[in-house]
Amino acid sequence: MKIIELKKLSFRYSGEDKEVLSDIDLAIEEGGFYVICGASGSGKSTLLRQLKTSLQPVGQRSGRILYYGRDLEEVSQYTQSAKIGFVFQNPDTQIVTDRVWHELAFGLESIGMPQDMIRVRVAEMASYFGIQNWFYQSTDTLSGGQKQLLNLASVMVMHPKVLLLDEPVSQLDPIAAADFMATVHKLHAEFGITVIMAEHSLEEVALLICV
């Protein structure tokens, strides 16, 4: 089943003449693992951001973006928040609270989930990611690798269908990068989550896929 489809998608930023994306047709099958590879400035991040309306950049867009056959603009923000997860390149970009436990709970709180359900989901995800030892720590004390794992866990606690990763290990050391990608592969294998990842280097892509 196609979870995401792009039909003749084009985009140019406001004030720019050149299109960053031009007539892109793409079908993403549910449960697949996809890598978008290209040089810096080739439009990888722009393309990923098109797949979640709250992250779409300002500019001129044409074509269609479908989520399970529905135009993305018609999909509620509640559904997009829960079912389309996004992890940014910079580990510090999306952390919004000062404690690890609260960061895990924040997304669920924002969609109005009852507190008892939040506690269960947060406990499950903390155990799955092995972050119990730093569960009560300040987010400011975490390493880059820990922050990026926390970002991933904070997305996964929402039980998303799609995981969008924008060069997620480019700012991590090799060991942290390997740990992060091993976790992504585990999530994909065990939960069947659809993964779409942007990377700039074919060599890096080969290493990441072989983790």
Regions of interest found by a model, annotated:
Residues 71-85:
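ABC ATPase NBD coupling module
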Residues 138-142:
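Conserved ABC ATPase signature
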Residues 159:
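Conserved catalytic motifs of ABC-family nucleotide-binding domains
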Residues 199-200:
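H-loop/switch region of ABC-family ATPase nucleotide-binding domains
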